[in-house]
Design a protein with these regions (language model features):
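ABC transporter nucleotide-binding domain
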Residues: 172-261
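Extreme N-terminus of proteins, especially the signal/transit-peptide cleavage junction
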Residues: 1-4, 299-300
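ABC transporter nucleotide-binding domains
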Residues: 3-8, 13-206, 210-212
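Structural motif detector for alpha-helix initiation sites
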Residues: 30, 95, 216, 285-288
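Short acidic active-site motifs
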Residues: 72, 215, 268
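Short, charged/small-residue-rich alpha-helical element at the C-terminal edge
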Residues: 225-299, 303
Length: 303
């Protein structure tokens, strides 16, 4: 991955008195899958709309492939495949007719047979009228229209919304394939397991502020692990005072079982245990969801 595909610098957006984006700084690398995490109202959709000049920020600068969306909105839109989060498809088109219409409007379009193959993979019947489709099938049409052109960037706002688990997985497979072919993927989601499966890096947004950005694996690895140790005999003298990343949560009365938190690397912790008669060691590694919830707790511990 080289170069910058998307750059936001000190971006602010107000809706009346509501400060939706609060000085957002963000860089997305060319060719990566960037997962943008946050619940409804955090600022995910507002960010994407600003990047496409569908709405305009009050302050700050945005560049997509080096272009300013406010000065070159048509050029930016031509280089981006976009799936909106509030997708609304109406009218007398069939799904096939709609996709053919979009294909005529776009340059550098994908082979029609390739689109048919994608439709088959996500189990979409193309000859029904859009107005008669379920919301899940409308979502599939929306995904396909974002794939009509071969573009360097895709912006997908909640791409698996309304889909069943099998179709969600297939959509993620398609997204990964596009990235493998060099496309930069920026996708927002509130479904943590999806982001964990495919994102190279993750940004967590809370109330319009980017509170964390990191490699997905790095974010999980540096989180707090929970370890439960069972000893073959009582170990009343177990001492972790020399390790600043260990916090003892619970010790059984017979001193045969300990529950601890281990922050960051595990090497020193494991070496300390080598001096004791360990029967069993269980380590719970947090999911991305648990990491995410840590960032979303306020000062009272409430989410």
């Amino acid at each position: 991955m080289t170069g910058t595909a998307i750059q936001l610098t000190k971006v602010h957006k107000y809706y009346g008195k509501v400060h939706a984006l609060r000085g957002l700084d963000l860089e997305v690398h060319q060719g990566e899958i960037f997962g943008f995490l946050g619940p409804n109202g955090a600022g995910k959709t507002t960010t994407i709309r600003c990047m496409l000049d569908l709405i305009r920020p009050n302050h700050g600068s945005i560049r997509v492939l080096g272009l300013d969306p406010q000065k070159s909105p048509t050029a930016v839109k031509a280089k981006v495949g976009y799936l909106p989060g509030d997708l609304k498809l109406e009218g007398d088109f069939t799904a096939r007719g709609f996709l053919q219409h979009i294909r005529r409007l776009r340059r550098n379009h994908r082979d029609w047979d390739d689109l048919l193959d994608l439709a088959e993979r996500i189990d979409l019947t193309l000859d029904q009228k859009i107005e008669n489709l379920s919301q899940g099938n409308k979502q599939k049409v929306g995904l396909l229209q974002s794939l009509v052109s071969k573009v360097p960037v895709m912006m997908l706002d909640e791409p698996t919304l309304g889909l069943d688990p099998l179709m969600k997985q297939e959509v993620l497979n398609i997204v990964r394939e596009e990235a493998d072919n060099g496309t930069t993927i920026f996708f927002s989601s509130h479904i943590l397991s999806e982001v964990q499966k495919i994102a190279d890096r993750v940004g967590i947004i809370r109330k319009g502020i980017l509170v964390e950005i990191a490699q997905t694996d790095e974010l999980i690895n540096r989180a707090i692990n929970c370890a439960t140790i069972q000893f073959k005999e009582s170990v009343p003298d177990l001492d972790f005072n020399h390790l600043s990343n260990i916090k003892v949560l619970r010790i059984n009365d017979d001193h045969r079982s300990y529950t601890l938190e281990v922050a960051g690397e595990m090497d020193s912790f494991i070496k300390t245990l080598a001096d004791y008669p360990v029967r069993d060691l269980a380590i719970h590694r947090p999911s991305l969801e648990e990491v995410f919830l840590k960032y979303y707790k306020d000062d009272t511990g409430e989410v």
